[in-house]
Structure formats: structure tokens, C-alpha cells
Amino acid sequence: MATVTPRTLSGFMELLPAPQQQMERMMEILRTTYSRYGFTPLDTPAIEASEVLLAKGGGETEKQIYRFQKGDADLSLRFDLTVPLAKYVALHYNDLAFPFRRYQIGKVYRGERAQRGRFREFYQADIDIIGDGKLDITNEAEIPSIIYQTFTSLGLTRFQIRVNNRKILNGFYAMLGLTEQSGDIMRTVDKLDKIGADKVRTCLTEDVGLTAEQADEIMRFISITGSNRQVLDALAGYQGRHELFDQGLEELNTVTRYLSAFGVPEENFAVDLTIARGLDYYTGTVYETTLLDHPEIGSVCSGGRYDNLAAYYTERQLPGVGISIGLTRLFYVLGEQGLLNPQLPTAPADVLILPMTQDLTPAIRLATRLRSAGVRTQLYTEQKKFKAKMNYADKLGVPYVVFLGDDEITAGLVACKDMTSGEQTKLSFEDTLSRITQGLSQRNQGKVILGK
């Protein structure tokens, strides 16, 4: 029979067992953190009707989407988790309690060009809060505070959540008489980190059609820097010239004040007028998060406030605020930079039992007792030589191997080897269990990420 050469498609990540354990550990920290803030887990279909996903219109989304026909059905793979959320809330409105707080960790699909650190299938980790008619400004401060707690729990320390408000930007552009061009301006400014200030200015004049004076005024505005207080004080100098600007500045002052109340240190968040977010549906506070020691990575977490996202599915006003972590990309770049903690265990089991007798009943009973005590235990039942069994234990990376032969069974003892130190003991079950649990608690110390 002819065989097919196994391969993984370009742009799709497939991990070996050890890094998969690291990825799972990251996801578990996210789930634990989000649950601590009262978010409920949600899962939505990977496949939706194309008209649902593309309700807003085509453009770049339609170029990147995986779309196919199945019989008469026009179907597409989801390209993010936000649009399915909008559909979900509109569909199940009568069964939900508002504000509706959900988190979702799931795969999304985009048919863009595969390149280093960019994937066509990747995990996103989203949190969103959806209101019914209104949504208090406090939520716009709580969302980035959750990201601070999440990244800190992962082990990151040198990161910065950059905060802005779209109303400030729209109000400022209105002052310049550029209301109609505001969307194009924000999409251009959003490229600042990628193409630099000179190219942004050129794009503003050549592509957007601004005058040199208008482009210079915008570049001066987005270049306002300093401490959060200094930036907010500088913005206060523009007050009174446009109502939308004043509203945005009031919201930004409130968000920064509440961020401090939520316990986010000022070194971890900054008012940054270059943050615009290219997506049109953002209407208020916007966020981007970067790793200070690795600016080349770009934003690893972004989001913001939106007021009309569900308008394509319902007449109800369902404002929301949310943020998304590109989990696959973050995991990839952390691995590339050597920032994933190699000391944390990645073995699928804590104990591997190697029976030394033909009758496996005692080994099965021992495995059952260890599992009942909460110890992840694997029973090796293959009839192979001792060396092959130990090679298997080494390859798995299990911290403890238990041998159970006639002598141990007769004496009511357990022979246990610490695979790190090489020390081997022969103790009662209770003493062996105590030794294993103490050793595991020491091994599980530390964060997933090596503190940068």
C-alpha cells in the first residue's frame, strides 16, 4: 500500500508533548484568572454561516476568511472570537444576565500569508463584558487590570498596557475639520510602530490627502509624551474646543484613576496617543500591550470599548468592552526568546509504575491508591526488558519511578526512585506518598514565563 508523506500545513502549529504541556499550563492560568473576576467560560462553533461572520461587510476580512460550500450552505471558519460573541449575545439575549461577562479560549482561522511568528490557525484568549443599553466606565478600567493580573501570574514583569480613547482622537480630528477622514487617519497612525513616524506622515499626505500643515498638527499631537499625569495635563489644554474630545478626556482620566485603584502600577500602564486600533467598531477606551524588552514582537494583547458591535444582529443596544491575547503567537515568541520556564515539569505523569511480576494486580491496586491521593500515575504494562522500561521513563521525563516486585509486595513496601537525584528508597505506601507529594510541591514552584 502506498503511503502518504506526513506533513503539517504551513501556518499551522503542531506541538510535541512537552511544549504542549507548557501551552496547557498557560491556558489554565488564564482560565483561573478570568474565573476569579467572575467571567463565565464560553465556546462557540468554529464554523458559522458566512452571512453571520461577514454581516459587517467584506474588505480585508473577506480576503482572509476560510469560506466553503457544503451543499447549499455557505459556511466560513471564524476569524476571531468577537463577532461570534456578538451573534451569541443577540441570539441568547433573553437567557443571559447583564452585564454578561465571558471568557473564551479557542482557535480562529485566517488565510493570510504564513510567516515567522504568524499563523493561519491560532488560539485567541478573549474576555468581554457586554451591557444592556449602558455599560459603566469602570469596566473599561477593570479589563486592563485583569490583563495586568494575568500577565503577572504568567511570570511577565516588564510589560506595558498602553491606553488611549477614540473619542479624544475623533474629537481632535473634528477640531481640524477632518471628521470624514478620521477612520483613514486612525488606521494610518495605527501603523506607527511598524513603519515609523516619517512614513506615517507621508501616508497622511499622499494616501489620506491631508495638507502638510494638517499632517504636522496630527504628528505633534500624537507625540505628546511624559508621565500619565503630564500627558493628561497636556490634553487638558485642548479642552473646550470640541464636546467629543472633552468626553473622551473625562473618560480617560477616570480609567487611569481606576486602574490605580485596581492595583495596576503606573510602570505597567501608560497613556499613549498613538494607540488607535485599526478596527472601526471601537468607540471609547482602547488598549495595546507590549513587552518592554521585546518591542519587535509588537502588541501581544489588544482591545477596547465598542458600542454597536451587535447592531448587525439585533436592534438592541449592547455596548461592550473586551481584550484579546494572541495566545499562539505569544507562546511562539516566548519560546523563541527562551522565556518559557524549562524547570517546570512537562511530563504527563508524576509517577511511572514498573511492575516486576507477571501478575499485575498489586501494581494496578497501587496505581489506584496513588491516583485516589491525587498523584498523576501511569502504569507501564508492556512486557519489555528493564532497560527499555527505564528509557521510556527518561523519555517521558517523569520525576518518580516506582518498582514493584515480589520482595516489595511481600514486605508491603514501595521502591521509589527520584529520577532527578537518583536516590532510591524502599518505604511504606504512606511514607512514599508523603515523599512524592513533598517533592512535587517543590518542583512546581515558579512561573510559566521567566520574569520579563
Residue ranges and their predicted role:
Residues 19-37, 48-51, 72, 84-94, ...:
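Positively charged, Gly/Ser-enriched RNA/tRNA-binding surfaces
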